[in-house]
């Protein structure tokens, strides 16, 4: 996790009002600018007008972080829902995604594969068990959380 993400996450988390929760903070290049994406959610999903209200709350808060972690040339702010295909970055994200269809990309191969798509059967805090389709058979693949480079929920068609 980079410094801006950690600083922003630690700073704004206590300011997010109930029933909302801070899902993730992302700091990425977007065209020629830097984009700070603050992903918020709530039980049952979040509405667009709620993200607008949260943006009005969060934007001035970010200006009070000291020392200022942002580049002098500024950045773009986005407050949004994690969406249907939401990123899975923390242990609690994986725990909440048990039973869902996911995509996982690994740092190193397991069973000669670096990417898996399937149902997340279980997660014990350290290991994911993913039910993947191997040709015509289903099989469970155990993936250590430490081996996961990227993961997200997927919409299954």
From Swiss-Prot:
Family according to the record: Belongs to the RimP family.
UniProt-annotated location(s): Cytoplasm
InterPro entries cross-referenced by the UniProt entry: Ribosome_maturation_RimP, RimP_C, RimP_C_sf, RimP_N, RimP_N_sf
Keywords of the record: Cytoplasm, Ribosome biogenesis
Disulfide pairings: none
NCBIfam families linked: PRK00092.1-2
Biological function: Required for maturation of 30S ribosomal subunits.
PANTHER family named among the record's database cross-references: RIBOSOME MATURATION FACTOR RIMP
Coiled coil: none
Protein name according to UniProt: Ribosome maturation factor RimP
Biological process terms in GO annotation: ribosomal small subunit assembly; translation
Gene Ontology cellular component list: cytosol
Entry annotated with the keyword Cytoplasm: yes
Main location: cytoplasm
Gene3D superfamilies: Ribosome maturation factor RimP, C-terminal domain, RimP-like superfamily, N-terminal
Top-rank taxon, per record: Bacteria
Organism of this sequence: Lactococcus lactis subsp. cremoris (strain MG1363)
Gene: rimP
Pfam families the UniProt entry points to: DUF150_C, RimP_N
CDD domains from the UniProt entry: YlxS_C (cd01734)
